[in-house]
């Protein structure tokens, strides 16, 4: 387990070989490449190196997703979602030619940013969760495959002031855990979210009110998972998922964490257990809460743009 700072935690652990790639997707819609062997090798108790110091990020650019890739195979896709409700699916093979300065993975409109990226097989169900508590579940096949320069298509219709806060690739065995800024949350069965066509307004995933506040996160969890709750003031609370109520969609949830009136919940995530062991012949790559940072070099300019669809 990594010896981490008091205000940080491990939320993802990848088992990777030294020659595997790490695709680092940023809020600006760019992707950068790292080889696993480029990461500093250290003992189990070492803190590691901030990823922002290893990539030529622009001022304010954040790494929002890291995908480990062993082979760039046909039939696999990179699925992306933005805060303004745009989604895009691009063949993984289109990310097989690394550039030191990075490339554009998604052409973003003004005031939009990339929130998350996942690798899929093209046959999964996708869920988007908004800050207003709305959730939409649709077939991944509803999103046609596009090149890197395309702007994507509408995944969910949002009202003014609303943002997509979570992209989830559905696992039928899991449950959806949603949490709000005033410390409330709940679990809901995946089957309670019926698939519909992409681009709609979705259904109520959790009731939002002055009492519980806007949604700050939604993740898929198993009954034996643990999660970390992070407040704006820096409070971290670790809790077991099986102690959180499983209720229907149209409810507000229960108290997950006691929040001071001047504080807010800002993030939730699954926590990787410190007892997880490395696989033989492979390295464990840990991704914690990534820090914001700046770099001097500008990224590569992609060739042309394509208008998005609705």
Mark where each language-model region is.
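Short, structured "edge-of-domain" segments at secondary-structure transitions
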Residues: 1-310
């Amino acid at each position: 387990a990594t010896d981490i700072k008091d205000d940080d935690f491990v939320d993802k652990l990848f088992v990777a070989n030294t020659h595997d790639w790490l695709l680092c997707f940023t809020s600006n819609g760019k992707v950068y490449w790292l080889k696993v062997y480029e990461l500093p090798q250290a003992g189990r108790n070492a803190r590691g190196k901030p990823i922002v110091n290893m990539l030529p990020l622009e001022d304010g650019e954040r790494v929002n997703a890291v995908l480990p890739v062993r082979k760039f195979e046909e039939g696999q896709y990179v699925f992306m979602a933005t805060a303004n409700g745009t989604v895009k699916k691009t063949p993984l093979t289109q990310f097989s030619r690394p550039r030191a300065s990075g490339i554009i993975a998604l052409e973003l409109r003004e005031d939009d940013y990339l929130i998350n990226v996942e690798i899929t097989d093209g046959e999964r169900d996708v869920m988007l969760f908004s800050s207003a508590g709305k959730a939409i579940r649709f077939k991944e096949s509803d999103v046609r495959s596009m090149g890197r320069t395309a702007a994507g298509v509408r995944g969910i219709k949002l009202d003014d002031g609303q943002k997509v806060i979570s992209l989830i690739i559905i696992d039928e065995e899991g449950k959806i855990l949603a949490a709000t800024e005033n410390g409330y949350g709940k679990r809901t069965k995946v089957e309670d979210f019926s698939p519909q066509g992409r681009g709609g307004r979705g259904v109520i995933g959790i009731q939002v009110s002055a009492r519980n506040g806007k949604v700050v996160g939604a993740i898929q969890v198993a009954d034996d998972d643990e999660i970390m709750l992070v407040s704006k003031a820096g409070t971290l609370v670790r809790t077991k998922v099986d102690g959180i109520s499983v209720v229907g969609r149209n409810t507000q949830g229960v108290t997950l964490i006691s929040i001071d009136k001047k504080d807010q919940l800002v993030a939730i995530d699954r926590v990787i257990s410190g007892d997880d062991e490395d696989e033989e012949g492979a390295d464990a790559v840990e991704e914690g809460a990534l820090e914001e940072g700046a770099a001097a070099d500008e990224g590569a300019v992609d060739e042309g743009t394509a208008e998005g669809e609705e």
